[in-house]
Curated annotation (Swiss-Prot):
Protein name: D-alanine--D-alanine ligase
This protein's pathway: Cell wall biogenesis; peptidoglycan biosynthesis
GO cellular component: cytosol
UniProt catalytic activity: 2 D-alanine + ATP = D-alanyl-D-alanine + ADP + phosphate + H(+)
Length: 366
């Protein structure tokens, strides 16, 4: 069988640039070399695309040139990558693109739209699901429409915070109380999230979060366990065994995810068998609520006092580092890391083939 060429894309103009590089390195190392030729494309913090086997390491070190400069051409008649060469403009053939771009410009539908314009296969959720999964305000509205239980929350725009902060504080205290969490609506990996237990901490939390986004989410805080479920599929969807995060810090913030060695992942989560099915069913409903495809990780909050389950959020491009929950949950469910990557590629190709069935011009009635 002829090998397929997979282009893993990482880095990007995002606060999660470093996380993306770490995830991508794990994927590049684990892709099946008997089936795939693997290319690595790094996007620097200015948005330039670089191709090379050492591009991840070069981006980490700031060692320029990072690799061979390339451009992506969103033209369905000659789609894909072109090397920067004013004479030859040599194309770089790619069968499937594997975006590993966490955060804005990567998992928000931006690069997915580029792939769609070029009509090329890619791994993961499409434009709509990616955009809805990135914007927590839209995500929560879709969850509400699907009758998925959520904790009380508010959406606050940056300009409202800057022009009427006293009113915002009063509204948060009246409707949510303390503790509460403030987070950017369009960031992942817990970047910019803070817990507030009083007014001074609330002000500091808002001032930090507005550095990352114009739209903020404020959620009521309760005493919870953090449960996560991995989802895999297109129209036919399966869910993994649930896992539990026991954070080293008070909550699972950026440092707890990527720096603290004493955060623990309990896989499978120590929950009742009946609750396992509940989490899995809700995870699949959340995935379908955003019209997901390929993969997602769905995060839940389990109230330690009442036992109530609340959906927290869906992550359409979860971390793939060696300590990331998404691949670990599938390993515990019976799908090893390398096989998981192959399945994701197959799902991306299947969705592409399904899309090619759609007419691009008006057809006569049957």
């Amino acid at each position: 069988m002829m090998k397929q060429t997979i282009a893993v894309i990482c880095g990007g103009r995002s606060g999660e640039h470093e996380v993306s590089l770490t995830s991508a390195q794990s994927i590049v190392d684990a892709l099946d070399r008997f089936r795939f030729n693997v290319l690595t494309i790094g996007i620097d913090r200015h948005g330039a695309w670089w191709l090379g086997s050492n591009v991840i390491d070069n981006l980490r070190k700031g060692q320029q040139p990072y690799g061979q400069r390339v451009y992506f051409i969103p033209d369905p008649t000659c789609p894909g990558l072109i090397e920067e060469n004013p004479v030859t403009r040599k194309p770089v053939p790619v069968d499937v693109f594997f975006p590993v771009l966490h955060g804005p410009n990567g998992e928000d539908g931006t690069i997915q739209g580029l792939f769609e314009a070029a009509n090329v296969p890619y791994v993961g959720c499409g434009v709509l699901a990616s955009a809805c999964g990135m914007d927590k305000a839209i995500m929560k509205a879709l969850f509400a429409q699907s009758d998925l239980p959520q904790l009380p929350y508010l959406v606050v725009l940056r300009n409202r915070w800057e022009s009427a902060r006293e009113q915002v504080i009063d509204e948060v205290e009246d409707r949510l109380g303390y503790p509460c969490f403030v987070k950017p609506a369009n960031m992942g990996s817990s970047v910019g999230i803070s817990k507030a237990t009083n007014r001074a901490e609330l002000v500091a939390a808002f001032d930090d979060a507005v550095r990352y986004d114009r739209k903020l989410i404020v959620e009521k805080g309760i005493n919870v366990r953090e449960i996560e479920v991995s989802v895999l599929g297109n129209d036919e969807v399966v869910a993994s065994v649930p896992g539990e995060i026991v954070p080293a810090h008070e909550f699972y913030d950026y440092d707890a995810k990527y720096a603290a060695a004493d955060s623990r992942l309990l896989i499978p989560a120590p929950i009742a068998a009946a609750d396992v099915a509940t989490f899995q069913e809700m995870a699949i409903r959340a995935f379908r609520a955003i019209d997901g495809s390929g993969l997602s990780r769905v995060d839940f909050l389990l109230d330690k006092n009442s036992g109530e389950v609340y959906i927290n959020e869906i992550n359409t491009l979860p971390g793939f580092t060696s300590i990331s929950m998404y691949p670990k949950l599938w390993e515990a469910t019976g799908i090893p890391y390398g096989e998981l990557l192959s399945r994701l590629v197959d799902l991306g190709l299947a969705r592409y083939r399904e899309k090619q069935r759609n007419a691009t011009e008006r057809l006569p009635r049957l």
